Amino acid sequence: MARIAGINIPPHKHAEIGLTSIYGVGRTTAQKICEACGIAYNKKVKDLDDSDLEKIREEVGRLTIEGDLRREISINIKRLMDLGCYRGFRHRRGLPVRGQRTRTNSRTRKGPKKGAAALKK
């Protein structure tokens, strides 16, 4: 099993798809990594040799991924909340941030419906 950036890459998947198991690496980034390393997208992870894996590790090392990316995102959200701007206010209240309607829908952000009795108390 290949281990890149502290993540086990599934050996039965293609290199492009396997790389997406790393937080912060999507399909496009995975394709760019494979291209930079000279590896075919459709090559299985188990078929990659050590030199290929080392090239991939080097490319992935240049990116902001996993814990660093999560930390950066949380710091950015905290900064918005500290500023008191509209987006920060929406984050703080747990409401949609990007202008979606809230009269109906937005149940994912707002959580399950509260009954009329719960609102009166």
From Swiss-Prot:
Keywords: Ribonucleoprotein, Ribosomal protein, RNA-binding, rRNA-binding, tRNA-binding. One of its GO terms (molecular function) is structural constituent of ribosome. One of its GO terms (biological process) is translation. Residues 94-121 are annotated as: Disordered. Pfam families: Ribosomal_S13 (PF00416). One of its GO terms (cellular component) is small ribosomal subunit. InterPro entries: Rbsml_uS13_C, Ribosomal_uS13, Ribosomal_uS13-like_H2TH, Ribosomal_uS13_bac-type, Ribosomal_uS13_CS. Located at the top of the head of the 30S subunit, it contacts several helices of the 16S rRNA. In the 70S ribosome it contacts the 23S rRNA (bridge B1a) and protein L5 of the 50S subunit (bridge B1b), connecting the 2 subunits; these bridges are implicated in subunit movement. Contacts the tRNAs in the A and P-sites. Part of the 30S ribosomal subunit. Forms a loose heterodimer with protein S19. Forms two bridges to the 50S subunit in the 70S ribosome. Belongs to the universal ribosomal protein uS13 family. This is Small ribosomal subunit protein uS13. It comes from Leptothrix cholodnii (strain ATCC 51168 / LMG 8142 / SP-6) (Leptothrix discophora (strain SP-6)).
